[in-house]
Amino acid sequence: MRNRWFSVMVGPSVRVNEWFSAYAMAGMAYSRVSTFSGDYLRVTDNKGRCE
C-alpha cells in the first residue's frame, strides 16, 4: 500500500481585540492511495474468531 498526502492553507488574519479575530483561509489538498488485489480485510468477532 502506498500513500501520498499534501496540503497547503494560506490566508490573512486580523486580531481586533482580545475577544475578536477575523481570518480567511484558502487551501488545496492532494491525496493518492494505491493498493494491490492481494489486500484483504479479515472480519472477526469480539473473541478473535473469523466469521
Swiss-Prot record:
Q: Name one GO cellular component term.
A: host outer membrane
Query: Please, which domain of life does this record's source organism belong to?
Result: Bacteria
Task: Give the species.
Answer: Escherichia coli (strain K12)
Pfam families to which the protein is assigned, alphabetical: Ail_Lom (PF06316)
What SUPFAM superfamilies does UniProt report for this protein, alphabetically? OMPA-like
Signal peptide coordinates: none
What this protein is called in its record is: Putative protein LomR
Q: What else is known?
A: This protein is encoded on Rac prophage.
Q: Which family does it belong to?
A: Belongs to the outer membrane OOP (TC 1.B.6) superfamily. Ail family.
